[in-house]
Structures are given as C-alpha cells and as structure tokens.
Amino acid sequence: DVRRVPVTRTPFLTRQQAQWREPLPVRVAVCASVMKINPNFLATLAEIERRSRVAVRFCFYMGFAQGLTLDYLRNAIHAVLPGAEVNAHMPVQAYQSALNSCELFVSPFPYGNMNGVVDAVRQGLPGVCLSGPEVHSHIDGGLFRRLRLPEALIATGYEAYIRATLRLVEEHDWREMLQHQLQDSDVEQVLFEGHPEKFADVISDVWQQHLPFDAASERVGTSQRLSS
C-alpha cells in the first residue's frame, strides 16, 4: 500500500492550550539517512535548542537505522541532544503519520537531502536548509525555490541557519501560513515537473564541441602509424 497519509494538523496554539500542565514542544523533524548525521549538524541543533524561547524537540526519522546501528546513533545524538526523539526505520505510512505530528523540518548539512525534503513538504512541513559551496549542497535550496518558500529559509552559514530555524520555531502564525501554502499547492507536480530535454541539449553541445578534437586526434594517430 503506497497511498499517502493525509495531513491533519490542528493549530499549534490550540494544542498548547489543551496541554496546560507543561509547555508543548515544537516538534522539528529531521529526515535523513544515517550517514548524514554529523557533529557540526548536531552542535547546530543544540545551539538552536539553547537559544529557543519556546520548548523544542528534534525528532529524528532515520532511514536504515536498525539494530546496533540504531543503538549507536541514538547514543551519539543523545550525547548532544538529550531530549531528542530518535526513531528507527519505519514503514512509509507510519513515517508519514509521524511527520504529521511535527511542525517543521531541518535539513542536515553539508549534504543534499532531496528525499527528506520531498517527504517533509508532501506532509505540509516548511523547513530550513543550508546552501554551501559544494555542488551537492545546492539541491535543497533549489527545491525550496521551486516551492516558492521564503529565501530566508535557505541559509548560507551556520548563524543564518540557526536564526531561520528559531524564527520558524517561535513564530507560529508564519509557520502555519507556510504549512497551508504547501498543503494548498500541488507539491508533487511542482517538485517533479521540469525540462529534461535541457540536460540532453547540454550533453549534445559538449559532444559537438569535442568532435573536432576527436577528429584531429584520429588524424594524428593515423599519421604516426603511417610514418612508422
């Protein structure tokens, strides 16, 4: 069964009022495979948690995290973020339902995180990403722009990443406006439409540029064989 779990999300402040005994944390999803969790990323999340004016909980949904790998990963994350929720690899519908319990997501860096971004925005979650100098760090920002998410959510440094996440965590109205924007748009159509023929055109141009060099190289090789 590959049907998507529908998004059902009550406004945060409404849920917060119902839970009066203790502050309701803003749940922040981290969707990524195991290899993308690294010390710089965890330290940045810890700084966000330290600075936040509201309770926040990072919820890790880790692809391929099972058995001893999950135990090791949970220990490593809890060493930096003691209150984090660390989940094992789960079936897709359970994963989507879990994302529905969150308010936003953060993309790990410095690697691109296309699958995690797609999973989160399909469930109506806005997020924050870090665009760096490497080619592999640009894809998240490209997806954000395609979805018309605010440029402020595409950070270019650690401090900007922290500030953008704090704003999304603390400003409930802004965050929920972005949630509705994503839910009201055809996210899958936006993400997967494109012009694949442009890639073929570029490859064709490169090939055409190399043809004269290949021909010249062939002539030189033929001449050398004849002279020998």
Model-derived regions, located:
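Catalytic binding pocket for nucleotide-activated donors in carbohydrate/polymer assembly enzymes
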Residues: 100, 104, 108-193
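Short acidic active-site motifs
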Residues: 93-95, 115-116
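C-terminal amphipathic helix plus adjacent low-complexity
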Residues: 32-34, 54, 60, 71-75, ...
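Short, solvent-exposed polar/charged micro-motifs at secondary-structure junctions
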Residues: 7-9, 69-71, 94-102, 162-168
